[in-house]
């Protein structure tokens, strides 16, 4: 038994080493004074200074954060509402909707990206033709009206694409919490005089919050990390951070990329730590309240 315990710990240590060794090497070489990715030339912060002075990177970072935050918020709201709606359906209808929801999760990103690009291009052209037809009407000319409903690939199409592929992840994260929820809790709140909104906000939502937070984190991570779908739906005027990194890597892997990747990793890590600490405090508070009651 003791030998098996040692072997299992050794195996676990090797797994974690395999997973995190590349990240530690990347972080270390982001402070390398040499441009080489194999030879250590001393400690420096120059690559971080150059990164902060790179306008293309900063612009892409701003776009990435704007798209990721907006897409995450919208996808979390829509996905949570959809998960609650699925839970109230009959089994056959629910299974059918869940099967449709799972298709984007298993679908290749390149297929999703190309199909969404074609949809946006087709829709933009159809709206442009419709605008032209409206402008050709005599009543529009008499009223001095000019219609233009057309659009090109850009920030809006990128945002819609991110919302679309984020929603299924939120649904999958929230559904297990809904299944664990005791339906009598909301009914008891209604019996005590609470409105449906108050019962949902005070009783149901706190129970679902761990799943909602997990879905939010997954959606944000998927959105900020996405390259393939963004590449096909962003157009030529908008660039995300992953697209800028790709263009930089095509030339050569510079220490600036190491510095940028390090900052992204640290930001996500800090976000996870803050959320986990918050959840731990909430769980401890609930246990204390349960003991008091």
Predicted regions and their residues:
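Transmembrane-helix boundary motif in ABC transporter permease subunits
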Residues: 1-6, 70-101, 118-122, 273-280
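Interhelical loop and adjacent transmembrane-helix boundary motif
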Residues: 2-5, 48-56, 224-281
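C-terminal transmembrane helix and the adjacent membrane-cytosol boundary/short C-terminal tail
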Residues: 2-10, 134, 175-190, 200-202, ...
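Transmembrane alpha-helices
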Residues: 11, 16-23, 103, 107, ...
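Non-cytoplasmic
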Residues: 24-37, 116, 169-171, 211-246
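Periplasmic/extracellular loop-to-transmembrane helix junction in inner-membrane transport proteins
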Residues: 35-71, 250-251
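Hydrophobic alpha-helical transmembrane segments of multipass integral membrane proteins
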Residues: 58, 62, 66-78, 82, ...
